[in-house]
Amino acid sequence: MILSCIRVVSSLPVIQYHAAFAAYTKYIPVLKPIIARLRQALMPDALEQEKEMPIRLGVPKETEDGERRVAIVPAVAERFSKLGVEVLVESGAGDGSYYSDASYTGATIVPSAAELYAQADLIVKVQPPTEAEIGQMKAGATVAGMMLPHRFPERVKLLRDKKLLSFAMELVPRISRAQSMDVLSSQAAVAGYKAALMAADRSGGFFPMLTTAAGTIRPAKVLVIGAGVAGLQAIATAKRLGAMVEGYDVRGATREQVESLGAKFVDTGVSAEGSGGYARELTDEEKQQQQQVLEKHIGAADVVITTAAIPGRPSPKIIRKDVVEQMKHGAVIIDLAAEGGGNCEVTEPGKQIVHSKTIVYGPLNVPSELPVHASEMYAKNLLNFLTPMIEDGEFKPDWDDEVIADSTLTRDGEIKHTPTRELVG
């Protein structure tokens, strides 16, 4: 039995050997010293090779159209190096975020993606890996990034069939100790900030009140729908720009957060607290009550920013077409929920249109428009997520850890995330 265990763990790549060894010895503790001594006696060359070969962290260049972020910035690459990890960076990976190859001091610059995937044990990405990229990853590799399994089930199948270990960063549980790993929150903060700037840029008037020789200019009225991370950042930014800001969310608990930023909370009398920090779906009666109150505020607004989105599900329709047609001429709607179809009925994802003299813009991949800080925040999220799994340059995930277990998408040829498994079949 002992020799059988040795054969199994010894045949695995370095990155998976330690996880398998830990699994055996966890359930049969007495085997730990025996296996260790036998491996030392029977396979000294393999052990020496493992000591000389720390895991290799691969940072490829993002291939998605318009994606300017990079998964690891130079400062974070140095942090990984201090953990004993060898960092490989594809040439040009940081160009979109204004990080040159030379700025990745201590990292190895690899000329092509194919060469990087052939060497990397642990791959980190912003966008989900494409089918071609998955095909280039070596056996036993691990990949971490935003996987969007609901949008790309075929890619999840490939990860499963190739028996790759994958972590979906959007599945990191929303608990206190995982806040520093939460890529959804960090990137939503970027999107909320940028949304307020997009609105100000498209508005036909000033945001702040101005007193001029020609008289006083009234401040713009801004309504932000959805008081999650993106919505609160949009509120804060619009306030800094001098606008009169109102905020709305179906979760009553957000009132205090909205008001703490100096905005007025719109109370529709509807409260819909859900699980995981998200709102539950409204009943038809609640939707009608919500609409009656919101329509008045939308009609009075110069700018409306919508942020109501739930990962993996269509965005709720909050602003009807006829409501848009009753808005002020020249009013602006920035629909941050466009990735899921939009909160406004007339939103065309990725496009700016004018409907009944109202500007409606549904931007996509907004964090990529601020690549420097979006990349920095994302890289720190990855560092905080992966650091507990790395010990002396070796990959040792604790599968009993809630954060690690909940974030695992595929492992050992299985889809571990239940909703994705049901979707893929």
Question: Where are the regions that the model predicts?
Answer:
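Glycine-rich phosphate/diphosphate-binding loop of Rossmann-like nucleotide-binding domains
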Residues: K61, D65-K82, E86-V89, L210-H297
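A structured beta-alpha segment of the ubiquitous adenosine-cofactor-binding alpha/beta core
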Residues: T108-A118, P128-P129, S275-V303, A308-K321, ...
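Residue-level detector of alpha-helix initiation sites
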Residues: P128, V190, G228-V229
